[in-house]
């Protein structure tokens, strides 16, 4: 019997609560017909990486050993006859799966299950040619071997369709999971941010006898026992027609709306009438009695570009009622970043909180997955990727048709405990951690470098994709691998240049003039503190710093 140890696509550690964000765009909602899904993978204390698993045809009787990214005993399961190549979280057929954790009812976690959510995603990508197939593969695997993570939402997408799937286990000693998956209408957008969001869903009149799942007009799928199990556990007692998955398995509370649904709200607000979305502000305060909940999806006012989505991944509620740069807690440099924890107490015991935006310093990696049915798979699927906070990096195009990963993104070069200039994670963090403490003074230099790179990639990709049509499959794989490595090297060089600029330009808390990424001759200036901070200092210190009249 042949055995293979499964290599995970990313190295992960346990992440903090309220971690990870997904934005999802249907093909008719995007400007060019792309299906788009994104992933900010957030959590302190881990460095992400980009992995690659090669395609393969496997012998009968071949086994693979599942080893959870959290450690523990390895379990053997039969290998599939054929497995697809996977780059990051997209396979060679342009199928992508991303996730956010919403936990849900703690008693439903099954520690004896063999599949955690990340291993489940990885195996499904290796075995699925479409999003629909991936959903059914995930269901089959947890039914057979058990599921040991908490409640999860998955965006399961291919070049034609985007699906959202919510899944939670059945508790200790019980294999399987209860789940619902809904197809995102092609002309809509949606988002997930660590809360369960599917409530009522279309249902069949009579469940099939031989299958463990139901399909409703190709737009909804769900486990056959999703309602009966909730009744068994005492989570629901009403009629089937009024059943809400979220209310049964992942009920809302203040944290779920303010730290999670607020991120969805901000994304929607970018793409529809802001005033209409501001009507949901009472919901973000958990005032459920006076305000409706957010819709599951919306139709954007105008079609969405992939660059718009990159910008959305960097959101800190700027320009909204939740703007993090506009009060004293933003500090002297109008920072949208805050230290942990999310919840804290004042010296008098008053309970307080801070906002939790889409863009955050604890991101280990960020990606925007773009699937295009109008291009051949190897070049149609591209993941815009980098390691660290989306706000502080440039997205590097990584084609799904490559055959190896660029060195700076490899796991062995991104050790959380050892700085290296050859590590994308550490080069991006090196720059970000210079900018964080003096945000308003330095962010303009970073945005300039970010835009320069992403503009270049956007233009160069047009040439790459035009040339791809004339190449054989082998030539195309080599070409895309080389171009992806060149793109990554360009990012690393530009970020090294940016780091050197920041220390020279902003040395000793002044600001020297610069042009085209280099310091120029001229008189330095001293950047002013944020007005809100100055006013707060004046109010707090009284007459101490008031200058006398002259």
Please state what every model-predicted region is.
Residues 20-117, 137-301:
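A contiguous strand-loop segment
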Residues 264-352, 356-358, 463-464:
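Accessory, solvent-exposed terminal regions and/or long lumenal/extracellular loops of proteins
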Residues 447-550:
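Histidine-centered catalytic/metal-binding microenvironments
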């Amino acid at each position: 019997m042949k055995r293979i140890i499964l290599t995970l696509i990313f190295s992960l550690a346990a992440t903090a609560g309220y971690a990870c964000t997904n934005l999802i765009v249907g093909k008719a909602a995007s400007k060019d017909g792309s299906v788009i899904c994104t992933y900010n993978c957030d959590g302190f204390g881990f460095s992400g990486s980009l992995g690659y698993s090669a395609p393969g045809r496997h012998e009968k009787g071949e086994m693979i050993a599942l080893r959870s990214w959290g450690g523990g005993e390895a379990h053997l399961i039969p290998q599939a006859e054929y497995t697809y190549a996977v780059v990051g979280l997209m396979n060679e057929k342009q199928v992508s799966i991303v996730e956010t954790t919403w936990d849900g009812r703690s008693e439903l976690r099954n520690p004896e299950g063999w599949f955690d959510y990340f291993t489940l995603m990885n195996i499904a990508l290796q075995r699925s040619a479409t999003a629909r197939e991936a959903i059914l593969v995930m269901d089959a695997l947890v039914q057979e071997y058990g599921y040991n993570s908490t409640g999860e939402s998955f965006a399961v997408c291919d070049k034609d369709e985007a699906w959202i799937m919510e899944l939670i286990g059945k508790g200790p000693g019980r294999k399987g999971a209860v789940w619902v998956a809904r197809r995102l209408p092609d002309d809509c957008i949606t988002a997930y941010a660590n809360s369960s969001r599917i409530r009522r869903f279309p249902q069949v009149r009579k469940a099939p006898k031989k299958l463990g799942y139901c399909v409703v007009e190709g737009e909804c799928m769900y486990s056959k026992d999703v309602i009966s199990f909730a009744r068994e556990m005492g989570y629901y007692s009403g009629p089937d027609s009024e059943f809400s998955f979220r209310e049964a398995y992942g009920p809302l509370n203040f944290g779920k709306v303010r730290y999670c649904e607020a991120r969805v709200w901000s994304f929607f607000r970018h793409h529809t009438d802001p005033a209409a979305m501001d009507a949901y502000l009472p919901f973000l305060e958990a005032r459920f009695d006076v305000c409706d909940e957010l819709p599951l999806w919306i139709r954007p006012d105008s079609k969405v570009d992939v660059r718009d989505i990159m910008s959305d991944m960097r959101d800190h509620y700027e320009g909204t009622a939740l703007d993090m740069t506009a009060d004293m807690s933003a500090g002297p440099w109008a920072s949208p970043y805050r230290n942990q924890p999310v919840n804290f107490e004042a010296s008098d015991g008053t309970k307080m909180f801070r906002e939790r935006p889409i863009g955050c310093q604890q991101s280990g990696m960020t990606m925007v997955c773009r699937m295009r049915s109008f291009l051949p798979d190897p070049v149609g699927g591209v993941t815009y990727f980098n390691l660290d906070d989306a706000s502080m990096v440039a997205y590097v195009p990584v084609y799904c048709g490559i055959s190896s990963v660029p060195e700076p993104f490899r796991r062995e070069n991104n050790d959380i405990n050892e700085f290296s200039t050859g590590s994308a994670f550490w080069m991006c963090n090196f720059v970000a951690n210079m900018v964080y403490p003096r945000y308003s003074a330095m962010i303009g230099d970073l945005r300039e470098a970010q835009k320069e790179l992403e503009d270049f990639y956007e233009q160069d990709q047009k040439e790459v994709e035009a040339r791809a049509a004339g190449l054989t499959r082998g030539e195309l794989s080599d070409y895309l691998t080389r171009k992806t490595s060149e793109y990554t090297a360009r990012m690393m060089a530009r970020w090294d240049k940016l780091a050197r600029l920041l220390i020279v330009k902003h040395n000793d808390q002044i600001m020297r003039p610069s042009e085209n990424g280099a310091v120029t001759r001229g008189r330095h200036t001293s950047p002013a503190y944020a007005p809100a901070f100055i006013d707060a200092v004046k109010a707090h210190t009284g007459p101490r710093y008031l200058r006398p009249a002259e």
